A protein has these predicted regions:
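Active-site segments that bind and position negatively charged phosphate/pyrophosphate groups
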Residues: 2-124
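C-terminal charged capping/lid subdomain of soluble metabolic enzymes
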Residues: 100-169
Length: 169
């Protein structure tokens, strides 16, 4: 692991977790919006991921949003928790990182083991998106119906994931 980068990313995520609901509920709140812009600038800085492999598949998969007139952030809000669940089911070695995310960013109660903490963290993220940000959490809520999933699979196949119907519908 790369503790400096990991800690910086965790702090950025925690800051976004704290400030984004304020920026959404109070769009005129300069401090919250400025903090979000500053956090976004840091998140895009390669310093945060220097030295370790990132999960760029999520951003590659998200490119479908331009086809369906969704913002980048909305598409990521919909697919990120499902993508995390997919990764956790595919590769249990991510459980520790996802558990840390749940505990330190989402503020979950310790469930006693990494796998349970990872699942609780993903659930907390999903609830945050739905309940605090008031965003849709499925593609079907965005009127992306089953007949469009074959087209969406081209994005999935480009990043070596499986049938999108199973994950996001």
């Amino acid at each position: 692991k790369y503790p400096l980068q990991f800690n910086v990313v965790e702090t950025l995520l925690r800051t976004v977790r704290q400030q984004l609901p304020i920026a959404v509920e109070e769009p005129e709140n300069y401090s919250a919006r400025a903090t979000m812009l500053w956090a976004a600038s840091w998140a895009l800085n390669s310093f945060c991921t220097s030295g370790y492999k990132t999960q760029a598949q999520l951003h590659a998969l998200e490119q479908f949003s331009s086809t369906y007139d969704m913002t980048h952030g909305l598409a990521l809000a919909i697919i990120t928790p499902k993508w995390m669940t997919y990764l956790l089911n595919k590769d249990e070695t991510v459980a520790g990182d996802f558990a840390r995310f749940g505990l330190n960013v989402m503020g979950i109660q310790d469930q006693g083991n990494d796998m349970a903490n990872a699942k609780a963290g993903i659930e907390a993220l999903q609830n945050f998106i739905k309940d605090e940000l008031h965003l849709p959490t499925t593609l079907s809520e965005m009127n992306i119906t089953d007949e469009k999933f074959d087209e969406l699979n081209k994005f999935v196949n480009a990043v070596d994931i499986y049938d999108i119907r199973q994950q996001y519908g």
